[in-house]
Amino acid sequence: MANIKSAIKRAKTSEKRRVANSQEKAAMRTAVKRVDALVLEGNKEAAQEAFVLATKKLDKAASKGLIHKNKAGRDKSRLAARIAAL
């Protein structure tokens, strides 16, 4: 454990951010998986609605630096292609 006061504070804030980032990433992954599941079911309307939420989560994660912006774009493109193929 850190001894210096500022290092102790940084450790606390880093842990808080780590937990928050982890939750944000998990929510993003869940949204993407939900779209995939709906595509497999063949439910195009529900998949399109879930796609809107997944897009929002991906963009937010990219803007916060949790994922690279190109990964967000790639994932959105792949999801859109799967939905369009229905």
UniProtKB/Swiss-Prot annotation:
NCBIfam families per record:
S20
What family is it from? Belongs to the bacterial ribosomal protein bS20 family.
Q: So which domain of life are we looking at?
A: Bacteria
Q: Name the Gene Ontology biological process terms.
A: translation
- GO MF annotation terms: small ribosomal subunit rRNA binding; structural constituent of ribosome
Stretch list, region Disordered: 1-25
Lineage at the top is: Bacteria, Bacillati, Bacillota, Bacilli, Bacillales
Keywords attached to this entry: Ribonucleoprotein, Ribosomal protein, RNA-binding, rRNA-binding
This chain belongs to which protein, by name?
Small ribosomal subunit protein bS20
Species of provenance: Exiguobacterium sp. (strain ATCC BAA-1283 / AT1b)
